[in-house]
UniProtKB/Swiss-Prot annotation:
<feature type="domain" description="FMN hydroxy acid dehydrogenase">
    <location>
        <begin position="13"/>
        <end position="369"/>
    </location>
</feature>
<feature type="binding site">
    <location>
        <position position="121"/>
    </location>
    <ligand>
        <name>FMN</name>
    </ligand>
</feature>
<keyword id="KW-0560">Oxidoreductase</keyword>
<feature type="binding site">
    <location>
        <position position="171"/>
    </location>
    <ligand>
        <name>FMN</name>
    </ligand>
</feature>
<feature type="binding site">
    <location>
        <position position="264"/>
    </location>
    <ligand>
        <name>pyruvate</name>
    </ligand>
</feature>
<dbReference type="InterPro" id="IPR013785">
    <property type="entry name" value="Aldolase_TIM"/>
</dbReference>
<feature type="active site" description="Proton acceptor">
    <location>
        <position position="264"/>
    </location>
</feature>
<feature type="binding site">
    <location>
        <position position="267"/>
    </location>
    <ligand>
        <name>pyruvate</name>
    </ligand>
</feature>
<feature type="binding site">
    <location>
        <begin position="92"/>
        <end position="94"/>
    </location>
    <ligand>
        <name>FMN</name>
    </ligand>
</feature>
<dbReference type="InterPro" id="IPR000262">
    <property type="entry name" value="FMN-dep_DH"/>
</dbReference>
<dbReference type="Pfam" id="PF01070">
    <property type="entry name" value="FMN_dh"/>
</dbReference>
<dbReference type="InterPro" id="IPR037396">
    <property type="entry name" value="FMN_HAD"/>
</dbReference>
<feature type="binding site">
    <location>
        <position position="180"/>
    </location>
    <ligand>
        <name>pyruvate</name>
    </ligand>
</feature>
<dbReference type="GO" id="GO:0003973">
    <property type="term" value="F:(S)-2-hydroxy-acid oxidase activity"/>
</dbReference>
<feature type="binding site">
    <location>
        <position position="143"/>
    </location>
    <ligand>
        <name>FMN</name>
    </ligand>
</feature>
<feature type="binding site">
    <location>
        <position position="145"/>
    </location>
    <ligand>
        <name>pyruvate</name>
    </ligand>
</feature>
<comment type="subunit">
    <text>Homotetramer.</text>
</comment>
Amino acid sequence: MVVVNGYKQNENEKKLNVLNLDQLEKQAKEIIPTGGFGYISGGSEDEWTLRENRRAFTHKQIVPRALTNIEKPELETNVFGIPLKTPLFMVPAAAQGLAHVKGEVDTAKGVAAVGGLMAQSTYSSTSIADTAASGTGAPQFFQLYMSKDWDFNEALLDEAKRAGVKGIILTVDATVDGYREADIINNFQFPIPMANLTKYSEDDGQGKGIAEIYASAAQKIGSDDVARIANYTDLPVIVKGIESPEDALYAIGAGASGIYVSNHGGRQLNGGPASFDVLEDVAKAVNGKVPVIFDSGIRRGSDVFKALASGADLVGIGRPVIYGLALGGAQGVQSVFEHLDHELEIIMQLAGTKTISDVKNAKLLNIRY
């Protein structure tokens, strides 16, 4: 255990015997300090949308298929021209040093071990270059919270390009911080600095809450901003935080190379729909023009299957990976991915689907309780 400014950072490095991801969360709560756990696990206001992200997966059911001669399903896929061994990826999540002393560096190692993709956050505990290097050549994206300071944006985009990342994720649903009651109750302020802010900003984020940090980000974002980012970098730009078909088409029209359906894990607009409930409509509007990425609420292999069958090309997981990081470092991250991949393989076989392409063509039953 390492103590920084009174905050205890875990140093665990071990494989995990994962039963399910809900149990993993309970285990992580025991070892992550209260303020850090509240920041990681919490949603906005009374967390209605956070809960809806889980309930939404009950709105569709997978049709079992038995007489299909299927065995040994294959998880390999290719998105943005990037070959991947799993359709799962690690979402951009801030300040992973709250869970483990090595933070994003260990997350990158764990994701690389399963042949997956990781997305770095602007507000990472470790630098773009260090995180990319620790991934041993595995593909990574970099997520940008667009700053009011264009020089800051350019510096991050330039470093991301030098570090070899494969795409830029532009977050557009965080022009103001959601009202996060857990952070208020815990009077939570980041106890450790954010490496990219340390390097390129006058303030490293240490000793501040997320609302104060967001205050330096752009308070309004439009399609012209998407175009500006897309014109500046030659990397594909994926627009994150899309929940309406209209916004998806605006983003594509402005130069987006990908659409990322997400409600920020229920941390922003409380009272909005679950991301899974809007995924199919957004994917239909996109109509194959660009890849569709999805996150929010994934906890089971069946959730992954349903997301892929509803139009997602890549499926993101966030909090469970951070819990795995806290409990086991890089090996813990690897354990979380392997558990979900295993569940997905079982579901694929029972649903008569051999490949991820088969899953994407699978029909789901629409049922509302």
